Amino acid sequence: MNLASISQSYMSHNENERSIVPYIPPPYHPTAPALAVSASQMETMSLGILNQAMSSSAGASGALKDEKAAYGAVAEALRDPEPIRKIKRQVGIQTLKTLKVELSGMRRKKLILKIIMFICANVTMATSLVGGMSIVDEDIAKHLAFDGKGDWVSKTVHGLNLLCTTMLLAANKISEKVREEIARTKRDIAKRQSYVSAATMSWDGDSVTQLRDVKYGD
C-alpha cells in the first residue's frame, strides 16, 4: 500500500466521522397516564347518584325537594352524550337568567300582597271592634246612627268590614299561589344550576370551564 492510498483512506474516515450527528434524547418528564371514562362507568355513576337521591329523607321540606331535583339533574347530565350536554348547558345558562328575573318579580308580588293583607287585616279588626261595641253599648249605636236620622255610618262600617274581609281572603289565596310558583321556580333553578355545574366538570370532579355572568342562589 502506497502513501497516496493511505492518505485517501484516512481522509474518507474523517469525513464519515464528521457526517455523523450525535443524537441527544429529549429530557424525560414523567406524567400520569390519561384515563378515559367509558359510557358504562358514566351510567354507573348516574345510577349511584339516583340511589343517593332515593335513599335520602322523604323530602318533607322544600330544601330536601330541591336536593332531590338537583341529584336528578346531575344524573341526567352524566347520562347525556357530550354534544347534547353542551347544548343543554348553553340553553340552561340562558334559562337561568330568565328564571332569576321571574323569581325577583314573584318576590316583589308576594311583598305587595303581604302589605295589602296587613292593611286589610287591621281595617277588618277595627271595623269589627266598632261594630261589636255598637251592639253592646247603646250610646255608641246612637252616635253611629247620626242623631237618629239614619244608620249610614253603621252601614259604612259594616260595608268596609265586608270589603276588607273579602280582600283579605282573596289576597291570601293569591299569596298561596305565588308561594307555590316561587317554590317551583326555585326548584327549576336548582335543577338547571346542578345540570350546568355537572356539565362543566370532568369525570374526576375538577372544574373545566368557569361560568360567567350567572349568579345562583337567593
From Swiss-Prot:
Q: Which InterPro entries match?
A: Orbi_NS3
Q: Which Pfam families match?
A: Orbi_NS3
Taxonomy, superkingdom: Viruses
What task does this protein carry out? Answer: May play a role in the release of virions from infected cells.
By sequence similarity, the record places it as follows:
Belongs to the orbivirus NS3 family.
This protein's name: Non-structural protein NS3
Q: What species is given as this protein's source?
A: African horse sickness virus 1
Gene name tied to this protein: Segment-10
